[in-house]
Amino acid sequence: MNKKIHSLALLVNLGIYGVAQAQEPTDTPVSHDDTIVVTAAEQNLQAPGVSTITADEIRKNPVARDVSEIIRTMPGVNLTGNSTSGQRGNNRQIDIRGMGPENTLILIDGKPVSSRNSVRQGWRGERDTRGDTSWVPPEMIERIEVLRGPAAARYGNGAAGGVVNIITKKGSGEWHGSWDAYFNAPEHKEEGATKRTNFSLTGPLGDEFSFRLYGNLDKTQADAWDINQGHQSARAGTYATTLPAGREGVINKDINGVVRWDFAPLQSLELEAGYSRQGNLYAGDTQNTNSDAYTRSKYGDETNRLYRQNYSLTWNGGWDNGVTTSNWVQYEHTRNSRIPEGLAGGTEGKFNEKAAQDFVDIDLDDVMLHSEVNLPIDFLVNQTLTLGTEWNQQRMKDLSSNTQALTGTNTGGAIDGVSATDRSPYSKAEIFSLFAENNMELTDSTIVTPGLRFDHHSIVGNNWSPALNISQGLGDDFTLKMGIARAYKAPSLYQTNPNYILYSKGQGCYASAGGCYLQGNDDLKAETSINKEIGLEFKRDGWLAGVTWFRNDYRNKIEAGYVAVGQNAVGTDLYQWDNVPKAVVEGLEGSLNVPVSETVMWTNNITYMLKSENKTTGDRLSIIPEYTLNSTLSWQAREDLSMQTTFTWYGKQQPKKYNYKGQPAVGPETKEISPYSIVGLSATWDVTKNVSLTGGVDNLFDKRLWRAGNAQTTGDLAGANYIAGAGAYTYNEPGRTWYMSINTHF
């Protein structure tokens, strides 16, 4: 970033202006002279691509491992990997509208979370990570907002698919506390069980001060090392005894505190500090499902640990004239400590038994400054102008991922201009952004919200993101909502780092018969997507029905390159991370909520994918169901007793069409997952005004899937050593599981 832009970023972010990016909406709008001020951020929450999960819904349908389990029941949302490879198949993360987990921005109280970026991206773009949706205990969540399409694009870098904003429960001026516990019992003993307990305490610290404190401890056991025995893809020779792994376990420890100072009417300062530790319990997974005696010996051990620290200072202000502002700075440090892994061919992602250290650290520092101001304007029409800015810096020190040797055995020889063994472990990038939106109420039934965002990235340069959202009432019951926006995602610190190099002896190379390298590329372009949607909504007397068409025209998606950019002295081809010119995602979302009676509510949503295509290769972008139907029937049987039934129906899942060399998938690589459904039952009893119990069963009819391997064949099926491809059978669907939770509060 040049000095002028850098200086401007620092000055503006000291609080002169404000950014509307990623801000948690205030609990109540500011009113002045009987005029309600509605900001663009709040108006976007009314877009067709927005859903909300409440604390009560989480209480009545408690999650086991991760809140992604309930987020996936929203329209347009599924769980998948970053590609069609099936690698790390059981570490599926949130995918919104088929754009992949890397294009889903995770926020906690409006502030981005970036810990998963400390995990290395493999050749196919996968990370060995559980994602960033488990840093807050489910019982500490007030609500979760899921934004899709144009409504999400306003949040800038990483939101091309959508945004998940996890909003925590707040403190108050009165003393309150809670203690919660959850445990489950899988019917199949080879599946890992979960136990969780947490507490919270809020209260006053004098007339102007208050606080909130929570702590959490949970443990999920790893699936048995042989859970997929008998379901693995065909394997021969040196791979004959290998097995694809089940779901890994995890131990979470969290502590978080906030002190709030209400120093004047409508003015507050909040200081937050948090610490989390997540350690996995190894289930036997390797990137290429080629386990050996050493990897099997690590079963049940912690093989990677994430230590996350976050600190933030927030100033929220309002004035009698309706002007509001929100300004905050956040520092997030993640230490990713893990067993060293191989970086070449079949050993990529496999524990390196000969490494000099038992564990190596990857340290990621993320500093973010945000500022926003909302200005009500009474000129021609009622409108609220939002102006803002943002500055973000990421710095990483990776002592492991830049160590692929370029000389000696299992290498492809030296690369001109690149050190063979002593490459820098450091990388960094900065983004400076300016932001403007105007929420205009043209008539009582017509709202227009134009917006414009500018981002300057220190490596890939400038990006402009215009947006336009329109809401038009059609009589008393119908509303037509439309939006179009240009979304944006900068490349990762791995993709732009020339010191990050992977090696393959040939099978992983797109157009090379022999060995090849894949190198980071500091000449990449940012990914962009033109996101469009049109939705029609009907509301009357508790009924709600809607249908939305969406299309994302995806440009410059970053993948491992398809064309060698050079060759070294010994004939090894050099590939780089590269931009795919065009891809497209298109689909339909529908919803239907029916008040069956005063005590019974039936809610439904469906997502149908029309297109998911890389226009360069013709391949799919990810493995997701053709359609997903979520249905919940809720019955308030008594004032203190509620029951619900959940039903999810997944359409067929098709695997990748082509292998890594661009050749059509054949044989077992073409296996599809047929449609299947999952049914759940639960009941919640409010024992007293301070105690409630929830019990239930997930997957009532015990529909299970087993991970058979990665999507593509490793080796030659006609040869002596191979692992056959698994097609779409790259993850485990757990069977019938009983659970219970207790929630207490005072």
Predicted feature locations:
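Outer membrane beta-barrel strand-and-loop segments of large Gram-negative receptors
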Residues: D366-L375, R423-S427, S433, N521-K525, ...
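A beta-strand signature from Gram-negative outer-membrane beta-barrel systems
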Residues: D128-D180, H745
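N-terminal periplasmic "start-of-domain" segments of outer-membrane beta-barrel proteins
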Residues: H32-A64, S68, Q93, S118-E126
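C-terminal beta-signal and adjacent terminal beta-strands/loops
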Residues: S114-N117, R555, W649-Y658, T684-F746
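Surface-exposed extracellular loop regions of Gram-negative outer-membrane beta-barrel proteins
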Residues: G279-L281, S458-V460, D476-K532, W549-Y575, ...
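Gram-negative outer-membrane beta-barrel transporters
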Residues: D180, E441-S445, W549-Y554, V565, ...
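Extracytoplasmic beta-strand/coil segments of soluble accessory domains associated
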Residues: S68-R116
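Transmembrane beta-barrel wall of Gram-negative outer-membrane proteins
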Residues: E190-N280, Y307-Q309, F379
